[in-house]
Swiss-Prot record:
PROSITE patterns: MGS
UniProt GO BP: 'de novo' IMP biosynthetic process
Family: Belongs to the PurH family.
Signal peptide bounds: none
Keywords from the named record: Hydrolase, Multifunctional enzyme, Purine biosynthesis, Transferase
UniProt xrefs under InterPro entries: AICAR_Tfase_dup_dom_sf, Cytidine_deaminase-like, MGS-like_dom, MGS-like_dom_sf, PurH-like
Protein's name according to its UniProt entry: Bifunctional purine biosynthesis protein PurH
Length: 511
């Protein structure tokens, strides 16, 4: 019996050449709608779906393949005598190949002017039903949903006269990944439209961007996936202009650097190592900002990741060229800057839009046996809700330093302490199990610069010891959430040493 293929695709990439190959192998081709028209325009002989079903396409194409003659031909187990007898009795013929991809739902809802009705109309029903039927019966049916697989199937047909069982199984697995991702997009769109924030089930879908050489360590395998919709201000959708492929650790560090630099509207540069900032500087231009970020910690910046929120110019590029860096991220690079930096063949240069995340963005964190979902921490300092419990208020310069330190401390691993002075960080204490330990690290790093600086803490002081350490170092202003049952003890110490302290009422833990 002559083999048959059913072809109905929205992505018509390579389909004409593929169908030519099928016809050359003596395979009969059934097709529908626009696909049939395209194939016939290219001189290919195909059978209309209505000739198989004996029923016209109706309801604007909503009903065309949902028919027993189609699904019987797909689902029949060819070595089951009962199935074969029923097919013969009902005049059905088997379908051996299904080449289908689905209505462009993702592309439709990505349009800024999409209406709800447009989105609903682009939910495919017949396509998923066909490819699921074919994939279930993959022992007998080859199902192709991705044009990238056309050459593999044709090569095996030419060599063996049939598709290998292993290939059929791989194609079937791909089908169910394809339909799962498709349904996830639909369910997430409808869930968002209804404003449901915590649905009873959560289905997420990501698309493979690249295999990575290894994960956090060489013995760990890793892959990088991207969100299905373009997130312009992200590492996943950044454009790499130069350098080696990104590694797992590169991606994590670049993401951290990008998150911090988004906090600033003035020219700013952030240096990151192991997902913690080692230096942050702001200035009247990007060169001045970089100089301050470098001076914040000229030791730790070596081998680090740099993020800037302005174009990198030649003067800044020449300074960056002087040290070893893994990555530089910026909205753009001047032509002269690129010439300077591209002389380092391994230095990765990325361009990305710098846009602050919104609270609607979700952060996913995997735990053993589960997944945590929360809003991104995008809350900025609200000066209308702060309080100053100390006798002295911050000076104008102290306010500048406090604000800078507060923007940075929310991005430092808890327990987190950041010291800032004169438009730059001068000390960062990260990830300690007690708060005073982080304070001591930041103060030690700052050295003499701590005198007259501002301190930010990501959470309240459970005891006054951190304020005492700050006073010893000559720190003159502190910003922290407040809310401890022992706040009065910290306030008393601050007043004793003339330290101005600000309560924000907002905690910024980061784990």
């Amino acid at each position: 019996m002559k083999k048959r293929a059913l072809v109905s695709v929205s992505d018509k990439t390579g389909v004409v050449e593929f169908v030519k190959g099928l016809l050359e192998q003596g395979i009969e081709v059934i097709s529908t709608g626009g696909t049939k028209k395209l194939l016939e325009e290219n001189g290919l002989q195909v059978i209309g779906i209505s000739e198989v079903t004996g029923f016209p396409e109706i309801m604007d194409g909503r009903v065309k393949t949902l028919h027993p003659n189609i699904h019987g031909g797909l689902l029949a187990v060819r070595d089951n005598e009962t199935h074969v007898a029923q097919m013969n009795e009902l005049g059905m013929e088997p379908i051996d190949f299904v080449i289908v991809n689905l209505y462009p739902f993702k592309e439709t809802i990505a349009k800024p002017d999409v209406t709800f009705a447009d989105a609903i109309e682009n939910i495919d029903i017949g396509g998923p039903t066909m490819i699921r039927s074919a994939a279930k019966n993959h022992k007998f049916v080859s199902v192709i949903v991705d044009p990238v697989d056309y050459d593999v199937v044709l090569a095996e047909l030419k060599e063996n006269g049939e598709v290998k069982e292993e290939t059929k199984r791989k194609l079937a697995a791909k089908v169910f990944r394809h339909t799962a991702a498709y349904d996830a997009l639909i369910s997430n769109y409808l869930t968002e439209q209804m404003g449901e924030e915590s649905p009873e089930t959560l289905t997420v879908t990501f698309e493979k961007k690249q295999d990575l050489r290894y994960g956090e360590n060489p013995h760990q395998k890793a892959t990088f996936y991207k969100a299905p919709f373009t997130v312009t201000s992200s590492v996943a959708y950044a454009e790499q202009l130069h350098g080696k492929e990104l590694s797992y650790n590169n991606i994590n560090d670049a993401d951290a650097a990008l998150s911090i630099v988004k906090e600033f509207t003035e020219p700013a540069v952030v240096a990151v190592k192991h997902m913690n900032p080692c230096g942050v500087g702001v200035g009247t231009d990007i060169h001045e900002a970089y100089t301050r970020a470098y001076e914040a910690d000229p030791v730790s910046i070596f081998g680090g990741i740099i993020a800037a929120n302005r174009e990198i110019d030649k003067a800044t590029a020449e300074k960056l060229h002087e040290i070893f860096l893994e990555i530089i991220i910026a909205p753009s690079f001047s032509k002269e800057a690129l010439e300077v930096l591209q002389s380092k063949k391994n230095l990765r240069l990325l361009t990305v839009n710098i846009e602050k995340a919104t609270s609607a963005s979700k952060k996913l964190t995997s735990v053993q046996g589960g997944l945590l979902v929360q809003e991104e921490d995008t809350l900025s300092l609200d000066e209308s809700t702060i309080s100053i419990p100390t006798k002295r208020e911050p000076s104008e310069q102290e306010w500048k330093d406090l604000k800078l330190a507060w923007k940075v401390v929310k991005h430092v691993k808890s327990n987190a302490i950041v010291l800032a002075k004169d438009d730059m960080t001068i000390g960062v204490g990260a990830g300690q199990m007690n708060r005073v330990g982080s304070a001591k690290i930041a103060i030690t790093q700052a050295g003499e610069k701590a005198q007259g600086s501002a301190l930010a803490s990501d959470a309240f002081f459970p005891m006054p010891d951190t304020v005492e350490e700050a006073a010893k170092a000559g720190i003159t202003a502190i910003i922290q959430p407040g809310g401890s049952i022992r706040d009065e003890d910290s306030i008393k110490v601050a007043d004793t040493y003339g330290i101005a302290m600000v309560f924000t009422g907002v905690r910024h833990f980061k784990h």
